Amino acid sequence: MLNTPRICVVVIGKTLEEFLSQLEAAQTAVDFVELRIDYLEQINPNWVRIIKNHTQKKAILCCRARADGGKFLGTPEAQQEILQAGNDLGFDYLDIDLPVANKISIHEKKAKIIISYHNFLHTPPITELNFLLENMRLFNPDVFKFATKSEQYEDVKTLFKLLINKKNNENMIVLGMGEQGKIIRLLSPLLGGYLTFSSINGAISAPGQIDFKTMQDFYQRFYKISSPLKGED
């Protein structure tokens, strides 16, 4: 049986005013948002508090470093401070990248933890992805996330294989970046993926990210086609 897709809209913005405006628009569309605070030109724990006060929906707090494909230029210690503030303020999820997971330790953990791996150059072979998955398991996260550049059909197959072979008790997000990766973004939540990400008002945070309305229309049409006809034996 196919899963009901969970769509998370990504919120970005250079200024606090722009960010809060995008957040308001996202929250009118969905019940799940990802707050990419690394896009802000300035960020501090007080701004995290302001953003939390404007957040009414389930939210992932993410402060991704430039080295991991984000915009944040601060130290791991600064990341730690921001994510710790997010935990203490009551955000539902914190996204921590695998390369810095051993440098960031959340005290008195309240939020669920997503451990992420991003590769903007290519999709590694399945053996390498499985090795990374084993490394992620050492941190005992609530959700595993893989996002890789998908340029050919083999990349799509590799990512679907990773998702389909996950343990039944594990939550996993699998995303393809680029045009070829769009099919993964659409189908992975139907095949056991924890959620998929979309954009709103053209505020895209990753290659191949699909507009929320387009994604919503796809799922509505998909379920209309796949639902059995009434009265059919």
From Swiss-Prot:
Signal peptide: none annotated. 3-dehydroquinate binds at residues 34-36, 64, 185, 205, 209. Keywords: Amino-acid biosynthesis, Aromatic amino acid biosynthesis, Lyase, Schiff base. Its EC number is 4.2.1.10. SUPFAM superfamilies: Aldolase. It is an enzyme of class 4 (lyase). The active site is at residues 118, 145. Pathway: Metabolic intermediate biosynthesis; chorismate biosynthesis; chorismate from D-erythrose 4-phosphate and phosphoenolpyruvate: step 3/7. One of its GO terms (biological process) is aromatic amino acid family biosynthetic process. It catalyses: 3-dehydroquinate = 3-dehydroshikimate + H2O. One of its GO terms (molecular function) is 3-dehydroquinate dehydratase activity. Belongs to the type-I 3-dehydroquinase family. Homodimer. This is 3-dehydroquinate dehydratase. The lineage of its organism: Bacteria, Pseudomonadati, Pseudomonadota, Gammaproteobacteria, Legionellales. The gene is aroD.
